[in-house]
Amino acid sequence: MAAGFKTVEPLEYYRRFLKENCRPDGRELGEFRTTTVNVGSIGTADGSALVKLGNTTVICGIKAEFGAPPTDAPDKGYVVPNVDLSPLCSSRFRSGPPGEEAQVASQFIADVIENSQIIQKEDLCISSGKLAWVLYCDLICLNHDGNILDACTFALLAALKNVQLPEVTINEETALAEVNLKKKSCLNIRTHPVATSFAVFDDTLLIVDPTEEEEHLATGTLTVVMDEEGRLCCLHKPGGSGLTGAKLQDCMSRAVTRHKEVKKLMDEVFKSMKPK
């Protein structure tokens, strides 16, 4: 009976749970799904991480290549993110060129990188005007059950912290790059941006970490990205219901709390990887 009602009237079915301050999956309105991260998942990548947010699963692989610095910024390198949402992760997506949702997600990640200054692009310069690192960050969604932006941001951060680049010098006689694979160093991660997403129901009610079904039924969504200093790095709201100043402040306060949880989880994972 309940399954039939959910199929015929999914929103009304959902509202009955919201009235009791809970959700069909058993969570409270402000409760996040179980979050896990595995670092170094791809042996052939220069850095990688696998993040699970409930059923939503994203893997990030980073490959470092040489490139010429931009002419207008000869002392900078590049960080190039790309989010892939294939039919593998959800039947909603099709093979071929990136769809709108994938393009929006890629631009969101690019904005997070730029606004948070997670990496100073000057740190990627090898020789000013001649050679720089290009970090290709491929974020592949393996299972899409909502809140893809939070999962992608977490996977990117963990993968960047996992990157190790070899020492590179320019031979003055030959003007060629010489790579010392025996001497590698980690990236200098300047900030730790963490995304926290919300869904708005009936223009007023906020829930955190929405599933795919919740995103579909919601009247709006919002993603807030904060760093460890409590600074707002990015705010993403693709239309939908408006929010009052008080609601927005509530979202930012919850995002600060969520940042501490994610940062603690990531610190524990990287601490466990260090040789004793």
Curated annotation (Swiss-Prot):
Disulfide bonds: none annotated. The gene is EXOSC8. GO terms for biological process: exonucleolytic trimming to generate mature 3'-end of 5.8S rRNA from tricistronic rRNA transcript (SSU-rRNA, 5.8S rRNA, LSU-rRNA); nuclear mRNA surveillance; nuclear polyadenylation-dependent rRNA catabolic process; rRNA catabolic process; TRAMP-dependent tRNA surveillance pathway; U1 snRNA 3'-end processing; U4 snRNA 3'-end processing; U5 snRNA 3'-end processing. It comes from the Eukaryota. This is Exosome complex component RRP43. Belongs to the RNase PH family. One of its GO terms (cellular component) is nuclear exosome (RNase complex). Component of the RNA exosome core complex (Exo-9), composed of EXOSC1, EXOSC2, EXOSC3, EXOSC4, EXOSC5, EXOSC6, EXOSC7, EXOSC8 and EXOSC9; within the complex interacts with EXOSC5 and EXOSC6. The catalytically inactive RNA exosome core complex (Exo-9) associates with the catalytic subunit EXOSC10/RRP6. Exo-9 may associate with DIS3 to form the nucleolar exosome complex, or DIS3L to form the cytoplasmic exosome complex. Exo-9 is formed by a hexameric base ring consisting of the heterodimers EXOSC4-EXOSC9, EXOSC5-EXOSC8 and EXOSC6-EXOSC7, and a cap ring consisting of EXOSC1, EXOSC2 and EXOSC3. It comes from Bos taurus. Non-catalytic component of the RNA exosome complex which has 3'->5' exoribonuclease activity and participates in a multitude of cellular RNA processing and degradation events. In the nucleus, the RNA exosome complex is involved in proper maturation of stable RNA species such as rRNA, snRNA and snoRNA, in the elimination of RNA processing by-products and non-coding 'pervasive' transcripts, such as antisense RNA species and promoter-upstream transcripts (PROMPTs), and of mRNAs with processing defects, thereby limiting or excluding their export to the cytoplasm. One of its GO terms (molecular function) is mRNA 3'-UTR AU-rich region binding. The keyword Membrane does not apply. Keywords: Acetylation, Cytoplasm, Exosome, Nucleus, RNA-binding, rRNA processing. The modification N-acetylalanine is found at A2. It is found in: Cytoplasm; Nucleus, Nucleolus; Nucleus.
